[in-house]
Regions:
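Alpha-helical transmembrane signal-anchor/signal-peptide segments
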Residues: 21-37
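N-terminal beta-strand/beta-hairpin edge segment
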Residues: 35-128, 136-193
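Short, flexible segments with low predicted structural confidence
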Residues: 1-2, 33-34, 233
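Short amphipathic alpha-helical segments
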Residues: 17-26, 121, 125-129, 133, ...
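Membrane-proximal interfacial segments on either side of biological membranes
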Residues: 28, 83-87, 276, 280
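Hydrophobic membrane-insertion alpha-helices, especially the h-region
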Residues: 2-17
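Extracytoplasmic/luminal low-complexity segments enriched in Pro/Gly and acidic/polar residues
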Residues: 195-280
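Hydrophobic, Leu/Ile/Phe/Ala-enriched alpha-helical segments that form helix-helix packing faces
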Residues: 29-34, 133-142, 146-149, 240-244, ...
C-alpha cells in the first residue's frame, strides 16, 4: 500500500499548474517520496503532447534500483508500466492543497477520471528481507503470532511464548527456509535466556493461489532438531498466508493480483497487476 501511494502520488504530484508533465519533473517527484533512491529512471509517452494539458498520459514507465520505501524496507529493483492515465487536474490541485494543509499522504484517487492499471515487477534480496524482519513493526507482529499460536506448547497453557530473531533464506526452485527462536514472553535477551530459547526451522515451497495469496507447499519444520507434527505446523502457516492476502487492499479501492513468484538463491522476484478505481 505504501509503495503504491508513493508511485501514484509522485506521478500526479509532478503536474505543473498548467498541466504539463516532463520526465525529469516526474522522476524528481517520485524520488522525493522515497526515503532513499540509488537509481531511478522515468519515461512518459504521450502522443499528441496536447493531451498533457488535459491530464492525459498514454503510458508511464518507471525503472529503479535500491529504493527505500521506509528506513527498514528496501526494494532491490522495480519496474512499472501503466496503461493510459486520465486525471482531473483541478480536482488534483485541490487534493494536493488539502494534503499539504493536513500533513498527510493519501492516494489521490478522487482525481482519477478512469481507473489506473499497471504492471509491476519487484525484486527483493535475502539481505533486505532479513533487515526488514528486524524492524520494530515486524518484531511486534511476531510477538502477537507467538502469543496466539504458541501459548499452549508442551501442554503449558499458562505459559506464553514469543518469536524472536527471525531469519529467512531464499533457496532455489521457489523454496524458502525460515529460522526463528522461541522465548518465554516478557524475557529479555541475556546469556541465560538465550540458552533456554528454542530454535524453530521451517522449510517450504511457495506458490500463489488465485493470484492473491501465498500457499506453502510440502512444508517441514523442527524445534531443536525435533520434527514439528504437520497438524501443528499447518494451521500456523495457513494463518501466516492469510496475513499476506492482498485482497485486503480492495478496501482501499486497490485491486492487485500476483502474476508470478520466482524464488532463487538470494533473491525473490514478484510480478503483479494493480488496478486503482476512482474514488468519488
Amino acid at each position: 500500500m505504501e509503495l503504491i501511494t508513493i508511485l501514484l502520488s509522485g506521478l500526479l504530484g509532478s503536474l505543473s499548474p498548467v498541466g504539463f508533465i516532463v520526465d525529469r519533473v516526474t522522476e524528481n517527484a517520485i524520488r522525493s517520496r522515497f526515503e532513499k533512491v540509488e537509481q531511478l529512471a522515468v519515461r512518459i509517452d504521450n502522443v499528441p503532447s496536447s493531451q498533457l494539458i488535459q491530464g492525459k498520459v498514454e503510458r508511464l514507465r518507471i525503472a529503479g534500483r535500491g529504493l527505500w520505501v521506509t528506513p527498514d524496507l528496501r526494494i532491490a529493483a522495480l519496474e512499472l508500466e501503466t496503461d493510459p492515465l486520465n486525471v482531473d487536474l483541478q480536482s488534483l490541485r485541490q487534493q494536493r492543497q488539502m494534503s499539504s494543509t493536513q500533513g498527510e499522504r493519501r492516494l489521490p484517487t478522487a482525481s482519477l477520471r478512469e481507473p489506473v492499471q499497471a504492471g509491476l515487477r519487484l525484486v527483493l534480496t535475502e539481505q533486505d528481507v532479513n533487515k526488514l524482519l528486524q524492524s520494530p513493526l515486524v518484531k511486534a507482529r511476531l510477538r502477537n503470532v507467538g502469543s496466539g499460536f504458541l501459548g499452549t506448547m508442551g501442554g503449558r497453557q499458562d505459559q506464553a511464548y514469543e518469536l524472536v530473531n527471525p531469519k529467512v533464506e531464499f533457496l532455489a526452485d521457489n523454496r524458502v527456509r525460515l529460522q526463528v527462536s522461541l522465548q518465554e514472553k516478557g524475557e529479555t535477551a541475556t546469556e541465560e535466556t538465550s540458552s533456554k530459547q528454542l530454535t524453530v526451522n521451517i522449510e517450504s515451497g511457495l506458490s500463489i493461489v488465485a493470484g492473491h495469496q501465498v500457499q506453502f507447499i510440502s512444508p517441514t519444520g523442527s524445534i531443536n532438531d525435533s520434527s514439528i507434527p504437520s497438524f501443528f505446523l499447518g494451521p500456523i502457516l495457513e494463518s501466516m498466508a492469510e496475513q499476506f492476502d492482498i485482497r485486503k487492499l480492495e478496501e482501499s479501492g486497490i485491486t492487485a493480483r500476483i502474476l508470478a513468484l520466482n524464488v532463487q538463491a538470494d533473491k525473490m522476484e514478484i510480478a503483479t497487476f494493480v488496478r486503482l478505481k476512482p474514488k468519488n
